[in-house]
Amino acid sequence: MTIAIGKSSKEPKDLFDSMDDWLRRDRFVFVGWSGLLLFPTAYFALGGWFTGTTFVTSWYTHGLASSYLEGCNFLTAAVSTPANSLAHSLLLLWGPEAQGDFTRWCQLGGLWTFVALHGSFALIGFMLRQFELARSVQLRPYNAVAFSGPIAVFVSVFLIYPLGQSGWFFAPSFGVAAIFRFILFFQGFHNWTLNPFHMMGVAGVLGAALLCAIHGATVENTLFEDGDGANTFRAFNPTQSEETYSMVTANRFWSQIFGVAFSNKRWLHFFMLFVPVTGLWMSAIGVVGLALNLRAYDFVSQEIRAAEDPEFETFYTKNILLNEGIRAWMAAQDQPHENLVFPEEVLPRGNAL
């Protein structure tokens, strides 16, 4: 037998291969190429939000207190949007507005654009992380497809909607009570609850919650009792080859309850993916429509009849009056720079008054 001794046929690794090996190495927390986008942007987005809610006032942009330092709590603190006068400026720290002054940048609302843009890229990086990991372990990329729903909603609400309006001012501020206020704004100015895309979104999200509850309960109800552990978590090996629960039994049960049931796991789980993701995408499309000031359903005949007949009123006409009240009160409070003053005779009144 002849043994050939010589140089290895492998070529030396270039910089890209070395980085690829290090980034995709098997470790406790996967980094990957997507991590180069995800980790820095998520760090800056969260850091900006914690900084803003802790220290930064909204007095100069909204006339509000919005930080822990001013007495807010977790539910009322927020990173507020820039003033309406700043329109769609990126509000870069080194830009003409702040001119490198960090304090002035915070006062102008620069942290909001900072958090919004870094947060958007962090969400995209997280979706790419799911793609990358799925490819590495030879899975299909449906996790990433599912995560596109929340990304679509975030981008449409925080970026596309204010881009269609006069400025970032009309986007939601990053805070719990601030987003509640934004929801009221959406109802008053866009009649959002009567928008068909909102209806599809509600059906998707609540339908998904119902599907999750039914699915979880059904699996628990049809577990095979062949484990000897003290509870569900100890009774089965995560790498077992056999089924954990009986699809046949579940099918028979729901066939008797509803008259119809899913016949296989693939269709069942695809449906559980399809319902919430489609609902979120429909909501996102609806918000893009609102950015262009597209209207929801208008039942003008009911409005005309209610105006002519004091005894005629529907839940729709009552809601329209409520929306007018939201606009009349919120516009003056929310946009003090417009100096809006409404005479009492134009403020909405119910037909009984």
Curated annotation (Swiss-Prot):
The keyword Calcium does not apply. It is a multi-pass membrane protein. Its EC number is 1.10.3.9. It catalyses: 2 a plastoquinone + 4 hnu + 2 H2O = 2 a plastoquinol + O2. Pheophytin a binds at residues 130, 143. HAMAP family: PSII_PsbD_D2. NCBIfam families: psbD (TIGR01152). Belongs to the reaction center PufL/M/PsbA/D family. This is Photosystem II D2 protein. The gene is psbD.
